Amino acid sequence: VGRLKSGPERELVERYRQRVEGMCRALGLAGLDTVELPESRARRDDDRRAEEAAALLEKAGASVLVVFDERGKSPSSEAFAEKIRQWRDEGRSGIACVIGGPDGLDPKLRQRADLVVSFGALTMPHQIVRALVAEQLYRALTIIAGHPYHRAGHDDS
C-alpha cells in the first residue's frame, strides 16, 4: 500500500527487481510484478486497514501470500529461500509480497498469509521495507540457485 516516489530508493528496488526477474526465469518461478495500491481515504484506521486488505487480497488471488509485518517471524535468509523452494516445488509459483501502509495491516491479511515475516520491531518507512523485500527475494533466489551472492556463515576473524 502506497507509492514509491522517484529517487534512489526506487532505483535500488528497480535494480533488484531486474535481478529477480532473471533469477525467476532460470528457476521456473513467475516473474515479478509490482502493484502499488493507493492508501484508503476512509476516516477510521480500522476502516482504512479493512479496505486496503480487501484490495490486497483481491490482487493476490490464489498466489502464495507473504506479509511483511512486525508481528511476524524473523526467518534466516536460508529459511526464507527454503520456503520459496517448497512453494515452487508444490507448483505454487506465484508469490504475492504485501507491505502495509502507514496504518499497518488488517488482521485478515495475517490470517490468510502463508508466511508473515518481520524485519524486527523497528518502524521503517515503506520505501526502505520495499528495498529490503526486493533484496531478500533476490538473495533467496540466489540461495536456491547455488549462486555465490549469499555468503552466510563466513567468519572473518
Q: Where in this protein do the model-derived segments appear?
A:
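Catalytic-core regions built around general acid/base machinery
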Residues: 16-19, 83-90, 112
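S-adenosyl-L-methionine/SAH cofactor-binding core of RNA-modifying enzymes
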Residues: 25-95
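Structured adenosyl-cofactor binding patch, chiefly the S-adenosyl-L-methionine
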Residues: 103, 107-156
